[in-house]
Amino acid sequence: MIEKIWFDNHFLGKLLWPLLWPLSCLFKWIATKRKSDYQSGKKQSYRSSVPVVVVGNITAGGNGKTPVVVWLVEQLQSKGYKVGVASRGYGGKAPHYPYLLTETTTPDISGDEPVLIKQRTKAEVAVAPVRSEAVKMLEQQGVDFIITDDGLQHYALQRDIEFIVIDGKRRFGNQHYIPLGPLREGVERLSSVDFLICNGGEPQENEVSMRLQPSEAINLVTGERRSVSSLSNLVAFAGIGHPPRFFETLNQLKANVVHTQGFEDHKAFEPTEIEQLMQYGEQLIMTEKDAVKCQSFAQSSWWYLPVDATFPEEKAQQILNKIIEVKE
């Protein structure tokens, strides 16, 4: 319901205005003061010896940051660089922090997105509630670049390159601060970053167009690959920042979806609640992010759909050149 207030001008927004407006003003004041304290030197920030690239946004919710992180890691790896990824590890509870992921780390330890990134890229991935601690651990691994998944507002960590990922269709909603609107920072922040990435929709001036390109569906148990359109009576579910984006992708792929179910982002699934969805169809299809949480109890009729970030070739080269210049 809160997203309907933020993005759809729902009438409840007007009813709740007297309650939410003061809270939004308080959020804005705290966020602005925190940023000012770090930038003025009143609070100490950490400067890494390794170039730090931040991929974040100015709104709450899922905008497509993780596919951008994966793309950056893979592109830099293809040029021979060793890349590390730092994350807060939201949704996980590690035995200690900072925590360096291994091939067998599960989402309940590190959170779902770090596991996805580790499995996709084989990069060094570290998590810690204080991101600078994760960065310090990655420095010890001898990485050439560190990419932070989210953390644009984590001013305790200095950075060399900043990306803001924008949902090209929902944009910035009603342009109010949390909780009345989706903003973590004001839209004026857009003018101070290195790259604005527009995920879907029509990119505005100075924005780089990005598309999420789906590949074949992959079976969670067997690893078999099949076109989505060849799967029948699908039940689709997603526990991501904006589930309708996933359902729309399936529709564009002409998937035979008979039921959809959205869950909150980073949800820790119980086997029974996913198994219950099977009553609506013959097979399940989910996002790659959800698949890492369902892998341990998956059934042979469960599939996931990976997506890859794609950019115009010229823009992709500009992005990589600017990052590599920092290293040189």
Swiss-Prot record:
Keywords: ATP-binding, Kinase, Lipid A biosynthesis, Lipid biosynthesis, Lipid metabolism, Nucleotide-binding, Transferase. GO terms for molecular function: ATP binding; tetraacyldisaccharide 4'-kinase activity. GO terms for biological process: lipid A biosynthetic process; lipopolysaccharide core region biosynthetic process. The keyword ATP-binding applies. InterPro entries: LpxK (IPR003758), P-loop_NTPase (IPR027417). Pfam families: LpxK. Its EC number is 2.7.1.130. It catalyses: a lipid A disaccharide + ATP = a lipid IVA + ADP + H(+). GO terms for cellular component: plasma membrane. ATP binds at T59, A60, G61, G62, N63, G64, K65, T66. Pathway: Glycolipid biosynthesis; lipid IV(A) biosynthesis; lipid IV(A) from (3R)-3-hydroxytetradecanoyl-[acyl-carrier-protein] and UDP-N-acetyl-alpha-D-glucosamine: step 6/6. The keyword Nucleotidyltransferase does not apply. NCBIfam families: lpxK (TIGR00682). Transfers the gamma-phosphate of ATP to the 4'-position of a tetraacyldisaccharide 1-phosphate intermediate (termed DS-1-P) to form tetraacyldisaccharide 1,4'-bis-phosphate (lipid IVA). Belongs to the LpxK family. This is Tetraacyldisaccharide 4'-kinase. The lineage of its organism: Bacteria, Pseudomonadati, Pseudomonadota, Gammaproteobacteria, Vibrionales.
